[in-house]
């Protein structure tokens, strides 16, 4: 049964962590040391070759010692914060990493977004000495939601954040109710020293709190002006109560099935928020939140330099994690004010006097959130849409027909389409109502970038809507064209 967090010590200032050292009992066993040496040697070789080294070193280390993640993490004095969910993982972990750094801590973070166990192991190796001793003192881990049940059998984080659960890659992931059951089964054995940080507005995520015997901290958006009626914010991925399977009712829907929900059949309802945005104002390049639920009841302003209501949720998740770490609100808000987007997450890249705004989209909910952000900021965008169908994207691209392009189509000034499934995307845009004279298919990543730039007047913004492997290819092309560094150099 979930235990609410009520400690009055939240938001107390945490000083810089004390110096630490490993005792002989804490030192990694010989097998972990061997795994560390093998992984770090692989990392060094890849770096000599100019490669990113964000996954393979971890794969090598785990082949030598399957417990390397748990053993390397165990030496971190402040424990680990793990962040999972369908959307928002990379942004939230970056925000948490910035916050703990602002508090004087030294995070170990899989910052590149490589979020399978191999990516997590690679990040730990990058931080560790050759003998396996950490240089950092707190882990900030982005975890792929399908991998969490396996990872949690070996790793017990101090904090586990779940951002949301939406329908995603149907050929790779379970349907969300099955995934939720697996997550609940993995959460059940966690010790009561682990704090869950859950999205109260997502009924599937909120119900995970019932699987945990330790503290649970809920966050959400309380602003009555954010959201609308059921069905107005995209296709819902969850219409049934996670407890009794009765129909859910909503007084306000923010996105898909996220909002102010309740079940008339069994009485389950959106839980009280420990941290909430009483007001959210979204601008073209930033958002302002007024935070309720802090000590004293004041509405504290929080500015984040990225637009979109979904980024308000990411910021709330990060602030809730900071609260669970006893990092002060002023420290956390200062860190968020200086936040710089991760690659592909509303990242802006200057090119020939234009700005390319990269937006990773991988499922209908994420696409609809991006579309909503474009519409609510009044843009008439020039689009570069890149659709791939590799394993990391989803082999099944039929999900693009669930994205609400019809809402965006009248605002599109021009669209360049590229990728392995460019013609599927072009057909989708055509059926959404984009006239053929405003739509062009361009094969080749660099050629598509050049075409989008050439079409846009100097000073204009090009919004790049891209799936994951297409993002990697576009980012590589942008690097080769001299507009940006490789993402692993960030």
Task: Give the label of every model feature segment.
Residues 106-108, 217, 300, 437-440:
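Structural signal for short hydrophobic segments within the conserved structured cores
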Residues 19, 24-220, 224-232, 236-240:
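Phosphate-binding loop of NTP-binding sites
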Residues 95, 119-122, 316-320, 369:
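Short amphipathic alpha-helical face segments that pack within enzyme cores
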């Amino acid at each position: 049964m979930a235990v609410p967090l009520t400690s009055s010590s939240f938001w107390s200032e945490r000083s810089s962590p004390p110096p630490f050292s490993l005792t002989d009992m804490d030192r990694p066993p010989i097998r972990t040391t061997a795994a560390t040496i093998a992984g770090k040697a692989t990392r060094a070789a890849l770096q000599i070759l100019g490669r990113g080294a964000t996954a393979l070193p971890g794969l090598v280390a785990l082949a030598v010692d399957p417990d390397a993640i748990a053993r390397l993490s165990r030496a971190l004095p402040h424990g680990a914060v793990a962040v999972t969910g369908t959307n928002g993982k990379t942004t939230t972990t970056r925000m948490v990493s910035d916050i703990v750094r602002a508090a004087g801590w030294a995070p170990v973070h899989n910052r590149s977004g490589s979020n399978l166990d191999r990516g997590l192991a690679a990040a730990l190796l990058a931080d560790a000495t050759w003998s396996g001793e950490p240089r950092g003192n707190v882990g900030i881990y982005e975890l792929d939601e399908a991998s969490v049940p396996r990872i949690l059998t070996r790793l017990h984080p101090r904090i586990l954040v779940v951002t949301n659960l939406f329908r995603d890659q149907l050929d790779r992931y379970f349907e969300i109710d099955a995934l939720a059951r697996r997550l609940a089964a993995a959460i059940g054995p966690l010790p009561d020293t682990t704090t869950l940080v859950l999205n109260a507005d997502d009924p599937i995520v909120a119900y995970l709190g019932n699987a945990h015997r330790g503290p649970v901290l809920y966050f959400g958006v309380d602003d009555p002006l954010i959201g609308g009626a059921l069905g107005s914010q995209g296709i819902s991925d969850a219409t049934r109560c996670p407890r009794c399977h009765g129909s859910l009712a909503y007084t306000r829907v923010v996105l898909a099935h996220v909002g102010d929900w309740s079940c008339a059949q069994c009485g389950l309802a959106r839980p009280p928020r420990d941290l909430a945005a009483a007001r959210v104002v979204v601008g073209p390049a930033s958002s302002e939140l007024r935070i309720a639920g802090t000590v004293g009841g004041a509405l504290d302003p929080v500015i984040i330099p990225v637009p979109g209501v979904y980024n308000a949720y990411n910021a709330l998740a990060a602030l809730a994690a900071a609260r669970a770490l006893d990092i002060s609100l002023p420290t956390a808000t200062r860190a968020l004010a200086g936040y710089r987007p991760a690659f592909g997450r509303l990242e802006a890249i200057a090119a020939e006097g234009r700005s390319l705004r990269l937006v990773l989209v991988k499922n209908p909910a994420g696409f609809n959130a991006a579309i909503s952000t474009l519409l609510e900021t009044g843009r008439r965008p020039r689009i570069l849409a890149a659709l791939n169908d590799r394993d990391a994207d989803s082999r099944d691209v039929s999900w693009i027909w669930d994205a609400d392009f019809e809402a965006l189509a009248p605002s599109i000034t021009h669209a360049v389409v590229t990728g392995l499934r460019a013609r599927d995307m072009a057909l989708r845009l055509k059926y959404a109502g984009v006239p053929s004279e405003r739509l062009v298919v361009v094969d080749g990543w660099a050629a598509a970038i050049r075409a989008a730039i050439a079409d846009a007047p100097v000073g204009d913004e090009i919004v790049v809507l891209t799936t994951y492997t297409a993002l990697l290819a576009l980012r590589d092309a942008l690097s080769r064209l001299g507009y940006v560094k490789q993402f692993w150099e960030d």
